[in-house]
Design a protein with these regions (language model features):
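N-terminal core-binding DNA-recognition domain of tyrosine recombinases/integrases
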Residues: 3-106, 122-125, 199
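DNA breakage-rejoining catalytic core of tyrosine-based enzymes
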Residues: 87-90, 101-117, 172-182, 197-202, ...
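Catalytic-site neighborhood detector that most strongly recognizes the C-terminal catalytic loop/helix
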Residues: 109, 169, 264, 268-289
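Basic, Lys/Arg- and aromatic-enriched nucleic-acid-binding interface segment
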Residues: 117-147
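Short, basic (Lys/Arg/His-rich) helix/loop patches that form interaction surfaces
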Residues: 123-127, 178, 222-262
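Conserved tyrosine-mediated DNA breakage-rejoining catalytic core shared by Y-recombinases
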Residues: 143, 148, 152-186
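Active-site/catalytic core of tyrosine-dependent DNA strand-transfer enzymes
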Residues: 182-234
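C-terminal secondary-structure termini that scaffold catalytic or DNA-interacting sites
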Residues: 291-301
């Protein structure tokens, strides 16, 4: 088990998975292997669909999310075992019983009224922390950058003459160059001139009090909450809503899937497809009348 788990985790490291994610992978794979050992298995080649199904039945989690997460990991591990010929049977990953049909969640985005309030906040607030807050939130809403990438912004990442931001995204290691809207540039400039402490740091956003330096944690989320307090009461209502809002607005402005992928730094189009649900205008064009399909509606209300 140790050799297989180590190889599997090394593969995930090469895919730039975070430490916390790797710990979850290790825990789930170890739990699966211990289950096999407890049931008398000392070789992956002996694994059968029946024992996989038994594992899925006995797995106990207090939440469906925890159970689903473990199954996603174990499925990936089973595919790894198949790929590297630890097992003799193919398709064992399909033997795990999910226990529930997939559900499409409603995408949470900022409303037009909330976007307007962000703009109004910018015009009426000018303390150092408020200037930092508005620059951070506008970067999220207008460029779609993740919180970790915003806090990692350095002076050399911004080309003021070309109005561009160029970074290597922390999550995907993708190099990306984005246009910097004028209002974003103005907000950053106002923060640098009137709000940022005179700190010897390469990072644009620094703490407002000594010791000055790069900020971490929930700084971006707290900035959003100070501007839109009601977001604090939204389940899962963190800073990532600004990225979803940015992607949705691109789609509403008739950007194509490839353009949105480039703007977000995504490699997989499936991660962008969920935003199509919010494009009411183009979704209506997909509808077909019953006459076109050859079906006739009889009777009435």
């Amino acid at each position: 088990c140790k050799e297989a788990i180590t190889g599997f985790l090394e593969q995930k490291k090469r895919e730039y998975r975070k430490r916390g994610t790797l710990r979850s992978y290790r825990c789930s794979c170890t739990s699966f292997c211990l289950f096999l050992i407890d049931h008398g298995y000392d070789n992956f080649k002996l694994i059968s669909p029946e024992i996989i199904k038994e594992f899925s039945i006995q797995d106990k989690h207090s939440t469906f999310k925890g159970r689903a997460t473990r199954f996603v990991i174990v499925r990936a591990f089973l595919r790894y075992l198949d790929e590297y010929r630890y097992t003799e049977r193919h398709g064992l990953d399909q033997c795990l019983i999910s226990g529930s049909a997939p559900v499409d969640k409603i995408i949470d985005v900022l409303s037009d009224e909330q976007i307007q309030r962000i703009q109004e906040y910018r015009m009426t607030h000018n303390t150092p922390v408020e200037l930092r807050d508005i620059a951070i939130v506008l970067l999220g809403v207008k460029t779609g950058l993740r919180a970790c990438d915003i806090l990692a912004l350095r002076f050399q990442d911004i080309d003021w003459k070309k109005c561009q931001i160029s970074i290597i995204m922390k999550k995907t290691k993708t190099q990306i160059t984005l246009p910097m809207p004028v209002e974003v540039g103005n907000a950053i400039y106002s923060y640098l001139k009137y709000g940022r402490p005179d700190a010897e740091s390469d990072f644009i956003f620094v703490r407002s009090k000594a010791p000055y330096g790069k900020m971490t944690g929930k700084v971006c989320t707290r900035a959003l909450y100070r501007i839109l307090p009601e977001r604090n009461n939204v389940k899962g209502g963190g800073f990532h809503v600004t990225r979803r809002t940015f992607a949705t607005n691109l789609l509403k402005n008739h950007a194509g899937i490839d353009e949105i992928m480039d703007a977000l730094g995504h490699r997989d189009p499936t991660s962008v497809m969920k935003y199509l649900l919010l494009d009411d205008e183009r979704s209506r064009k997909c509808g077909l009348s019953l006459s076109v399909t050859g079906l006739m509606l009889e009777g009435g209300l």
